[in-house]
Structure formats: C-alpha cells, structure tokens
UniProtKB/Swiss-Prot annotation:
InterPro entries: Aldolase_TIM, OMPdecase, OMPdecase_AS, OMPdecase_bac, OMPdeCOase_dom, RibuloseP-bd_barrel. Substrate binds at residues 18, 39, 66-75, 130, 192, 201, 221-222. This is Orotidine 5'-phosphate decarboxylase. It catalyses: orotidine 5'-phosphate + H(+) = UMP + CO2.
C-alpha cells in the first residue's frame, strides 16, 4: 500500500538532498519550513551511510530512499529487506530487473518492515530515467521502442509483479494514470517550477501541471536546494500546487 498522502501541497513535494554532505543535508532539512518528505540518493547514502535515514526520521521527516536497486533477485531481495527495516517509506528498484526480481524485492520489503515493527514501504519501479531522450535510447542501447511505448510496458510489468508504483517523467504521468488508478503511486522527477533552469533533465513539467496529469508526488531538487531562499522556493512550489489537489 502506498504511503498515505495528506491533502496539503507540502505532502506532495519530495525535496532531493542531492549534492550535499551529510551534515549539510541534515541541517538543510531541519531548516526548511514545512518540509514533509526528503529524497536520499546514492551520493548522500554512500557518504553518510544507512544512519542518515534514521537521522532524518528523527527530525520528523518521511524518507524516499532512491538507490535504484538493479541486480539478481536474491540480491535485490536482500537490499530491499534491509532498506525497509531502516524505515524508508519509498524505495526505488529498476523495472528492467524483471518480474522475478521485482516480486522478490516486494516480498522482502514487506518482510523487512514487519521484522522491524514498521509499516511496509512502497516500492517504486524506475522506468526510463528522465535524463534519457528517445534518440539516445535507440542509438546507445539499441532500444527500438519509443519512450511512449517503453514506459507503459515497464509500468505494467511492475504492477503485475506487485510493485506499488513507479517513477516516471511527468510527461508520461497522464497515460500511466489512465492505466493504473490510485493507489498506484506515480512519483515524478523532472519538475521545474516557473523560471527554473532545466539542467540535465530532458523531459520536464511544472509542479501544478504534473499533479494535474496524475502524479502522486513530485521530486524537486535544485530549484529548491540551490535557491537563494530555499524556504521561499519551497513555499512557492506549494503555492503553485494550490488548486491542483482535490
């Protein structure tokens, strides 16, 4: 089951603590007014270790652990079991790992959370990274499907395997939501509020538009973390969501 979402805009925004040292990430998260969710990615996790999840939870925050596990079924199961026991509420796995690995990961995540006395997390299958463009997928990976074909296929594979949601570009959110009603979670990076630079994201959308398209939650990093006034930038993102949430 997906983590419950309150009605407020702040519950829909996950701030990515990317590019920060551990102490900086903890301080930033503690000082951002109204923050509910944070994303811990590979760089921060490798530098800080698993304890960063506990430290953020001690600050009253909910954690999206974005490590994108992609391995054989037994290894993915072991990793998800331990990630769930840390208290992460959202955990990413690669859909390309295949149905056996996804099923093993899902079962292990439930087991790990139960053993730790926690509610089971939602696993999110990564479909196509938002940095990829269609021509590059064809040229570098010899994938002949269009992104519009590949993303729904991977999402369906994941849903059939029991995964509770997926990570997708906001540009694919409407099509996926039509196929997968809530509570299937759609978490979308590639969110760029009005006036923000696109950066290394190839498939982007504004916050209100992404929610209207069917996204459950939005991952926003640099437009907030690199802003002159991060709290004001976060508040502005929340304001942009007003009217987009039922």
């Amino acid at each position: 089951m997906a983590p419950s979402l309150a009605s407020g805009p702040a519950d829909r925004i996950i701030v990515a603590l990317d590019g920060m040292a551990p102490e900086q990430a903890l301080r930033f998260a503690a000082q951002l007014d109204g923050l509910r969710w944070v994303k811990v990615g590979l760089e921060l996790f490798v530098q800080a270790g698993p304890e960063v999840v506990a430290q953020l939870r001690e600050q009253g925050l909910r954690v999206f652990l974005d490590l994108k596990f992609h391995d054989i079924p037994a290894t993915m199961a072991g990793a998800c079991r331990r990630a769930a026991a840390l208290g992460a509420e959202l955990i990413t796995v690669h859909a390309c790992a295949g149905s056996e690995a996804l099923k093993a990961a899902q079962a292990a995540a439930v087991e790990g959370a139960q053993q730790a006395g926690l509610n089971p997390p939602t696993l999110l299958a990564v479909t196509v990274l938002t940095s990829w463009e269609e021509q590059r997928l064809q040229r570098e990976l010899a994938i002949q499907q269009s992104i519009g074909e590949r993303v729904p296929a991977l999402a369906q594979l994941s849903a059939t395997a029991g995964i509770g949601g997926c990570v997708c570009s906001p540009l694919e959110a409407a099509a996926l939501r039509a196929q997968h009603p809530e509570p299937f979670a759609l978490v979308t990076p590639g969110i760029r509020p009005k006036g923000s630079a696109v950066g290394d994201q190839a498939r982007v959308m504004g916050p209100a538009e992404a929610i209207a398209a069917g996204a459950s939650q939005l991952v926003i990093g640099r437009p907030i973390t690199k802003a002159d006034d991060p709290s004001a930038a976060f508040a502005a993102c929340c304001t942009q969501l007003l009217g987009s949430i039922d």
